[in-house]
Amino acid sequence: MTTTSAPDVYCVMGHPVEHSRSPWIHARFAELTGQRIAYTRRLVPLDGFARALADFAAAGGAGCNVTVPFKHDAARLATHASDRVRRAGAANTLSFRADGTVHAENTDGLGLVADIVVNAGVALAGRDVLLVGAGGAAAGVLAPLLDQAPRRITVANRTEARAQALVQAHADLAASRQVVLEALPIGQPGTGFDVVINATASSLAGGEVPVPDTVLREGTLAYDMMYGPAAQGFMDWARAHGAVPRDGLGMLVEQAAEAFAVWRGVRPPAAQVLQELRAQL
């Protein structure tokens, strides 16, 4: 008689979360790599992340992805954190170990860089980059962006003090990479950037693009970390000003591939899954 063990259980936690494509992506990764997992969405009350995390772990959960607005909470509640998590104060990937510890990683920036450099074919080395936002999404991508050695990264946020704090947390890394890293007011962040990355939820909330049109020039890569309809406003704005728009679908798949590798020890074929997912939209 043959017995089959239950699959390891994972989920994505957020608020909102119903739009997430992560369950399909991870199911496809598992199929292509021969892994047995179950992966679901979990809508978490805004004041209930710690309880949801504890309940999921107690029920035998193996790990979870964390999306807005809980990435800072995920970093704070973890037992162990990677260097990227410690710098950012934000985590998007949690692993629950048999000894009861929770390990935090942040794969957002790795996914963003892979999508820009590999999938979009845009080099970041020596470029001027504007990062719009200083919340968990922005914090999670700054170190991997610095690792690409751009000429300059400007962080612009509505609350300038938050941008300053994010810059300060990465000042040593910027110096070691010889990158100019600065925080400027969101209304006056500079002009003519090579790459503009929207790490705010302005598109998701239906709000206006929070930076002036002059941040763009002809051919600027304008990247919204959201995807699908949530990114449409930003992408329309970019296209209208001669920039090259790109949504965050590739980042989603690439960061998921990094998370899958953390959990399963296998790197799935992200490019294939991205192509398949793009065809569905």
Curated annotation (Swiss-Prot):
Pfam families: SDH_C, Shikimate_DH, Shikimate_dh_N. Its EC number is 1.1.1.25. Pathway: Metabolic intermediate biosynthesis; chorismate biosynthesis; chorismate from D-erythrose 4-phosphate and phosphoenolpyruvate: step 4/7. The keyword NADP applies. CDD domains: NAD_bind_Shikimate_DH. The keyword Nucleotide-binding does not apply. Shikimate binds at S20, R21, S22, T67, N92, D108, Y227. GO terms for molecular function: NADP binding; shikimate 3-dehydrogenase (NADP+) activity. The active site is at K71 (proton acceptor). Keywords: Amino-acid biosynthesis, Aromatic amino acid biosynthesis, NADP, Oxidoreductase. One of its GO terms (cellular component) is cytosol. One of its GO terms (biological process) is aromatic amino acid family biosynthetic process. NADP(+) binds at D83, G133, A134, G135, G136, A137, N157, R158, T159, E160, A161, R162, M225, G248. It catalyses: shikimate + NADP(+) = 3-dehydroshikimate + NADPH + H(+). Involved in the biosynthesis of the chorismate, which leads to the biosynthesis of aromatic amino acids. Catalyzes the reversible NADPH linked reduction of 3-dehydroshikimate (DHSA) to yield shikimate (SA). Homodimer. Belongs to the shikimate dehydrogenase family. This is Shikimate dehydrogenase (NADP(+)). It comes from Paracidovorax citrulli (strain AAC00-1) (Acidovorax citrulli).
